[in-house]
């Protein structure tokens, strides 16, 4: 569990920092939803190996990045967990027209530590009602798409009123995951991409049926503030490629129809 705590604590600290320094040569500044942490770290390493370009990533909640970009935050690319945020930036003239792309659809899971008495894989929703589950961590639904999906799923399962006083909110989905890993919460409704990561894959989990919440459609877009538009286009091209898609799939993301090398903007 110490490895889980350390990895997630580092992610939360990273997500709380807004990178403001000037980008170095061929360094692409990316604002990315926290659910992408492990997938994008791997994808970025392969992208750099193939192109020689580096990405400088800040992780956080999509809603917070949306607000920061509206206020002039200097990023080249937004990788949002909710495609509506980049869509709104395009309408507002803050993003490059025609670059919006739905790169993945996210999934949520009930996750508990490996030593938990309850097993959500066997109990499903009932795992959240087990004795000893005093706190349930989710991302803040006010600005985190995974938090909104968690609340919707709880409502559709008919247990929201039973558990709402036990909900604890992370600033983003990574902080919600840290709450469970550290023992501050006994269960969490988390992104499958984080539950599939090396620090968390040994935990107990149950994939929440996708029809219990609106699809978590994730969108990428190049911003008007981009200083390296060529590099930003190269990054999105790699994200759409078969190699990029395979990495996303390995972390539990579902690729949209037409994803892969021949994908087009949505």
Question: What function would you assign to each model-found segment?
Answer:
Residues 11-15, 264:
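Intrinsically disordered, low-complexity terminal tails and inter-domain linkers enriched
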């Amino acid at each position: 569990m110490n490895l889980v705590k350390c990895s997630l604590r580092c992610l939360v600290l990273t997500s709380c920092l807004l990178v403001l320094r000037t980008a170095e040569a061929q360094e692409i500044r990316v604002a990315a939803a926290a659910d992408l942490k492990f997938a994008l770290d791997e994808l970025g390493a392969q992208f750099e190996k193939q192109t020689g370009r580096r990405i400088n990533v800040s992780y956080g909640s999509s809603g917070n990045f949306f607000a920061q970009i509206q206020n002039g935050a200097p990023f080249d690319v937004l990788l949002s967990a909710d495609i509506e945020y980049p869509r709104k930036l395009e309408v507002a003239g803050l993003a490059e027209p025609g670059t919006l792309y739905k790169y993945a659809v996210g999934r949520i899971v009930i996750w508990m530590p490996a030593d938990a008495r309850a097993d959500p894989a066997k109990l499903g929703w009932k795992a959240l009602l087990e004795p000893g589950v005093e706190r349930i961590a989710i991302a803040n639904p006010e600005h985190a798409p995974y938090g909104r999906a968690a609340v919707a799923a709880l409502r559709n399962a008919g247990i929201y009123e039973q558990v709402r006083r036990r909900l604890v909110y992370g600033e983003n989905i990574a902080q919600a995951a840290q709450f469970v890993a550290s023992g501050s919460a006994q269960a969490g409704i988390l992104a499958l991409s984080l539950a599939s990561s090396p620090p968390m894959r040994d935990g107990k989990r149950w994939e929440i049926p996708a029809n219990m919440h609106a699809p978590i459609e994730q969108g990428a877009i190049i911003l008007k503030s981009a200083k390296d538009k060529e590099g930003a286009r190269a990054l999105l091209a790699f994200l759409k490629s078969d190699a990029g898609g395979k990495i996303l799939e390995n972390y539990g993301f579902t690729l949209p129809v037409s994803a892969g090398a021949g994908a087009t903007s949505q």
